[in-house]
Amino acid sequence: VMYMLISMELNDDHSEKVRYDYPDYPIYIRKGLLSHYPNYTAPNHWHDALEFIFVFSGAMNYNINGHIVLIQTGEGIIVNSGQMHFGFSRTKSECEFICVLLHPILLCGSYAFERDYILPVIQNTAMPYMLLTPQTPWHNLCLNFIRAFYENKDSAIAPLKITADFAALWTILFENMPKSPSEKLPQNRDLTIIKNMTGFIHKNYAKKMTLSDIARAGAIGQSKCCKLF
């Protein structure tokens, strides 16, 4: 198996500059090893694409907006659009996994379709992520699709096959996701604050920074800044 050394480039706001696999299709698919990251820890980052992880062997801790879950062999996770996240191993143990990033624009055929079927998923504040276990039938279908994304990545018609499977997975997710507390809830403001502050740190890491400077970048007090970090 060829493992790609995973290098991650971040923008000032801590969003990832995703290097997609196809010039015209926002699709990124890799098989990786956690040991390829410094200290078995990926950088904390976010992106508009949804992230899909399937663990082939070993296990991985995963931090989503400060919530830590354990993904074991045969399990996976879907991380929703715009969430701060990273994978790591507390014990520096090896983990072999598939990582897939798919941008929802792949499914946005029209404004009505985006409004009715895409936005209700990516704006669902009750679903920052979905841990997938094979014991739950609909989770198992999603896990099969994540493996299929990887298996189809070298096909002559890979973007077509992957987008078709993405639409099928999206349908399952749409039908089974937890209900959002409100149709029009704004994005979690704390996440916006964290993005602003991490962006400030990223931009000014070579300079001397105080807690006050970082808090000011998030337009919050120093005690709230400490609590968020």
Regions found by a protein language model. Give the residues of each.
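Generic protein-terminus/edge-of-domain signal
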Residues: 1-76, 83, 91, 115-116, ...
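Short hydrophobic/aromatic patch on the recognition helix
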Residues: 74, 224-229
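Ligand-binding loop in jelly-roll beta-barrel domains
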Residues: 82-107, 112-113
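Acidic/polar active-site rim loop that often engages polyanionic ligands
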Residues: 100, 121-127
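Short, Lys/Arg-enriched, Trp-marked, Pro/Gly-tolerant hinge/linker segments that flank
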Residues: 126-139, 152-218
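Short, Lys/Arg-enriched alpha-helical recognition elements, typified by the DNA-recognition helix
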Residues: 143-146, 197
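Helix-turn-helix DNA-binding motif, specifically the short coil turn and the N-cap/start of the second
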Residues: 221
